[in-house]
Amino acid sequence: MPVTPTSLADHLLVALPSLLDATFARSVALICQHDENGAMGVLVNQPSEYTLGEVLAQMDITTGDGDLQARMVLNGGPVHPERGFVIHDDARAWDSSLTVGDGLYLTTSRDILEAMARGEGPANAVVTLGCAGWGAGQLESELSENSWLTVPADAELVFQLPLEQRWQGAASRIGVDLFRLTDYSGHV
């Protein structure tokens, strides 16, 4: 009987210390879609070199909100680094949105950024440039190699916890202290 993969959408992937790839080391990825064809998510703890004000200006969207202009944009992953992805908690019908899970949504359309600039956007939002993608079976293979922990998605972690605490904070949600893990075993 074939094994049916379980969808990891609405879960966080937490990179284990043994994952040394420069893009994903110590990263936390929110999985937005996962099926037999692959998976797509965004990193939620990697700062980019851009502010939201710079991104909005590039798109000819103006705002007088200094806090919004200064907000850090995250590096969402190596796929489509020129595209914006907004993780948020607002169920309104934006032009291009996907329900990730209970109270978590992914929007890729301009209308959400325009609403944010007018002060009418979601109460909580994380803007990323780029996303992460896994081909069919690739994520499952990485999980079997112990590259990632899986943790149920947590809006408080995604929106409120400081970036530098998200990696350990996500693992601690399931009782794991990443600083106590080793990537070897054997006899003395």
Curated annotation (Swiss-Prot):
Superkingdom, taxonomy of origin: Bacteria
GO cellular component term of the entry, any: cytosol
Native source species: Stenotrophomonas maltophilia (strain K279a)
Disulfide feature: none
Protein's name in the database: UPF0301 protein Smlt1098
Upper taxonomic lineage: Bacteria, Pseudomonadati, Pseudomonadota, Gammaproteobacteria, Lysobacterales
Pfam family, one: DUF179
Classification via HAMAP family: UPF0301
Alphabetical list of InterPro entries matching this protein: AlgH-like
Similarity comment text for this entry: Belongs to the UPF0301 (AlgH) family.
